[in-house]
A protein has these predicted regions:
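Asp/Glu-centered strand-loop micro-motifs enriched in Gly/Pro and often flanked by an aromatic residue
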Residues: 74-77, 81-96, 110-112
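CBM-like, beta-strand-rich accessory domains located in the C-terminal region of large
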Residues: 2-3, 88, 94, 146
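Extreme N-terminal leader/anchor segments
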Residues: 1-82
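Sequence-level motif detector for i,i+2 pairs with an aromatic at +2
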Residues: 67-69, 82-84, 100, 328, ...
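Carbohydrate-active enzyme catalytic cores, enriched for enzymes
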Residues: 232-349
Length: 349
């Protein structure tokens, strides 16, 4: 293990992604997660893909190049460790560990998609299977497992290119185990974004992997309930964090598109939440294409907001979605290329 203190940059960087948890789960919940993770070894391995949802994740080419160079920037911390596997970084920072176990960095390596990037993606993915695939380690939380499954399904060709039959079997065996874990533990994910992420991962796996379609209908119904309970009538969420709301919209459009692409209709409450959120985010869009920054949210990756809004527009049947009055408690003024967004709402819950 490599002590992170040897590699810390002089100045911590701004967080890359929105934190999805207000704290650690209770000890009892963690014990139940650990038990379910260990029991996931009883799951039947998936044999292959029925179909793969079209990859919709957006990675950063620049961050991907930094990862290849050995610069790991997660959770507001930059660790410089050239030639060190990602699982050997010992930061002692739970948020850092959550981000690497969620595999969102796989989007960045796929954005580079050259030989060195693919080598690292494969080494780190199969390294995770070797070290943690039997239910060990901090990555067995429902929201992290859902996030990881989405990336593994999206980038399966990237990860499996040139792999041996034994490695391919290990990959599908791990997908089956993680799907079983999610099916048992998604309810324990915190309500809102973490639970939506867990359910979206379960839907992706159920639609994509042979023999797992039984999980799709219950997960789709649960996602619709979460939409009804957590997205208010104005398309807002309790945290009032614009970037977190963009995360929610992104996951909902991914799930809806995957369901539609497989010939299944998304639930009415699911589509209604997308229709409510989109105009709220459009009102929070700055002239440069980024989000207004409030309550811990950042502007988002270039092109992320526009892609999410375009997908929401397509799912709405091409209907114009426009906010009227305040949007999640924010007011907007605009003239030409100048926009002003004002927080005029109650404090976040």
């Amino acid at each position: 293990m490599v002590p992170a203190e040897q590699y810390l940059a002089p100045k911590e960087q701004e967080p890359t992604h929105v934190s999805q948890s207000d704290g650690l789960p209770s000890p009892r919940v963690l014990v139940m997660h650990r038990l379910a993770a260990r029991l996931s070894r009883l799951a039947r391995p998936a044999k292959g893909f029925v179909s793969q949802p079209e990859p919709r994740t957006i990675g950063s080419f620049a961050r991907g190049r930094q990862l290849v160079a050995g610069n790991f920037q997660f959770a507001g911390r930059l660790v410089e460790a050239k030639g060190v596997p990602i699982w050997d970084l010992a930061t002692g920072d739970g948020r850092f560990d959550d981000e690497i176990h969620g595999f969102r960095w796989l989007d960045d390596l796929a954005a580079v998609s050259d030989g060195p990037a693919r080598e690292r993606a494969q080494a780190w993915a199969f390294g995770w299977i070797d070290r943690y695939g039997t239910g060990k380690g901090p990555g067995w939380l429902p929201e992290l497992t859902g996030r990881r499954l989405i990336r593994w399904v999206n980038h399966a060709i990237f990860l499996l290119n040139g792999q041996s039959p034994a490695a391919t079997r290990a990959f599908f065996r791990s997908l089956g185990r993680q799907t079983r874990f999610l099916s048992q533990r998604w309810r324990a994910a915190p309500a809102g974004l973490p639970r939506i992420e867990a359910l979206t991962g379960l839907i992706y796996a159920g639609l994509s992997l042979t023999g797992l379609e039984r999980y799709v209908a219950p997960a789709s119904a649960a996602l619709a309930r979460e939409c009804r309970d957590r997205v208010d009538a104005e398309g807002g969420i309790p945290s009032r964090n614009p970037e977190e709301l963009l995360e929610v919209l992104t996951l909902l459009t991914w799930a809806a598109s995957a369901l539609s692409g497989s010939g299944r209709a998304p639930e009415r409450d699911h589509l209604a939440a997308i229709a409510r959120i989109a105009p709220t985010l459009r009102a929070l869009r700055q002239a440069d294409g980024g989000l207004a920054r409030f309550h811990g949210g950042e502007r988002g990756l270039d092109g992320w907001l526009d892609q999410a809004l375009a997908e929401a527009h397509a799912l709405s049947g091409g209907k114009a979605l426009t906010a009227h009055g305040l949007a999640m408690g924010y007011g907007r003024l605009s003239a030409g290329r100048t926009t002003v967004v004002i927080d005029a709402g109650a404090p976040p819950k």
